[in-house]
Amino acid sequence: MGPHGNDSDFLLAPNGSRAPDHDVTQERDEAWVVGMAILMSVIVLAIVFGNVLVITAIAKFERLQTVTNYFIISLACADLVMGLAVVPFGASHILMKMWNFGNFWCEFWTSIDVLCVTASIETLCVIAVDRYVAITSPFKYQSLLTKNKARVVILMVWIVSGLTSFLPIQMHWYRATHKKAIDCYTEETCCDFFTNQAYAIASSIVSFYVPLVVMVFVYSRVFQVAKRQLQKIDKSEGRFHAQNLSQVEQDGRSGHGLRRSSKFCLKEHKALKTLGIIMGTFTLCWLPFFIVNIVHVIRDNLIPKEVYILLNWLGYVNSAFNPLIYCRSPDFRIAFQELLCLRRSSSKTYGNGYSSNSNGRTDYTGEPNTCQLGQEREQELLCEDPPGMEGFVNCQGTVPSLSVDSQGRNCSTNDSPL
């Protein structure tokens, strides 16, 4: 989102460029421009490289092709478009002290900027709802939200985001009426985003605040349910060990099943924390800007131009953070390492007993005599011993079907996030 007003030179001269020696001042300005250009280039490269890596990893490795990760792809696409079509032109606008791409591209660029932010926050909102359904209605989850339905949801998110971003800007509903704004609209070299009060408030509420409130409310509920499940695991685990200590000493299989189930549940709750970090980071990066965006149109000149632009760029930098956050997930970490040739791509075993072969397909390589399920191996396998294990199977994900293996253990599949 372009800066309000035309005072974007502050990034070019730390001391106001008022040194008595003109040559010294010019050298400082040039050094500052070079430094800012390098910093902005690093930001653009980090955004593009990181999000291309995320999209490629999910597209290549079946293990990562879960419903939740479809939404992650949508989020990565929004960040990638931000890195390719928004941030570079914003950097040019600041470094060149003027807009060099004409009025049409100015409005189109601004529309893309609003589109990416809106699509990101709405996708995060959908992810929160997705996790809420998965953790509260595990038996219904896979029938409620299939991969095809997820694609439809993603399409709807982008359509709604497009309508709320392109329509008001291309129809000029956003335009202010004071002289400085009108002059900028007609000037080819000016691309400052002057808006009227109604648009600034309405667009901020629709594109950011409403999805943010929904996301925070739903995800707080998800964590409450997850906390209760972890407490249930602790109680059941203690009860199991007390009742079956002698059996565990004679045959370690039951204890192994419990530890494995507990480990699975903890892994799923760690995935929830990862998604929570993604949402929290997005909020911290963009909330200050949207607060300032409303304050600016209510009280003009109250917010310094420097603050407005810096907060706008704090939001841009958020697009580079998500790929780093995904590295909390062992599955994403391994996929990234294989794509970057830091790990051999054949028969590398995941921590949960899966291995990824050279064609990106995931196979289970755990214990012998495992459950034979007639479904794709991209789904997580969870085999549990019957005694005392009620409630562990649906600790986070879904249990569409149960089967029993040769050792009498209950088996289930789960569409795991991240």
UniProtKB/Swiss-Prot annotation:
GO terms for molecular function: adenylate cyclase binding; amyloid-beta binding; beta2-adrenergic receptor activity; enzyme binding; norepinephrine binding; potassium channel regulator activity; protein homodimerization activity; protein-containing complex binding. It comes from the Eukaryota. The modification Phosphoserine is found at residues 246, 261-262, 345-346, 355-356. The chain crosses the membrane at residues 35-58, 72-95, 107-129, 151-174, 197-220, 275-298, 306-329. It is a multi-pass membrane protein. A motif (PDZ-binding) lies at residues 415-418. Residues 59-71, 130-150, 221-274, 330-418 are cytoplasmic. Residues 1-34, 96-106, 175-196, 299-305 are extracellular. The modification Phosphotyrosine is found at residue 141. PROSITE patterns: G_PROTEIN_RECEP_F1_1 (PS00237), G_PROTEIN_RECEP_F1_2 (PS50262). The modification 4-hydroxyproline is found at residues 387, 400. It holds the Pfam family 7tm_1. This is Beta-2 adrenergic receptor. It comes from Mus musculus (Mouse). The gene is Adrb2.
